């Protein structure tokens, strides 16, 4: 239902919990959240808001609530979670996240890198400092919600 509206075709995330948001019984948004415990956090991603609901504020409310839940008993790792991380390439969502006091921007990659070239360089024993954007050549910006700001 949501896959045709996401710009990447990817396999399901390992160890992820999937959330669907409803308005009056209609499924309007989706997001996955997976542990990123090596940095004391969770990774929220693959958010999709159905086209007819985009721009209505549903996505931000959904994102904030799902991420807030990661600091509660709803997440089995909640005691280990210090932050929730979220990356997006959507300019409107980036602007909304920067306006929201719950979120801090922590990264941005304004252009993608060639994945095949990176693999070739690594196979040759060369290190690469070229940032990657998943091979889709979109500007990607990263945000973090810290536990203290979530509630």
Report residues per predicted region:
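Terminal substrate-recognition subdomain of acyl/acetyltransferases
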Residues: 1-40, 71-151
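Conserved acetyl-CoA-binding loop-helix of GNAT-fold acetyltransferases
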Residues: 49, 54-71
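Short His-Asn-centered micro-motif
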Residues: 45-47, 66, 84-89
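A structural signal for well-ordered alpha-helical segments within the folded catalytic domains
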Residues: 42, 56, 60-64, 91, ...
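Conserved acetyl-CoA binding element of GNAT-fold acetyltransferases
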Residues: 40-51
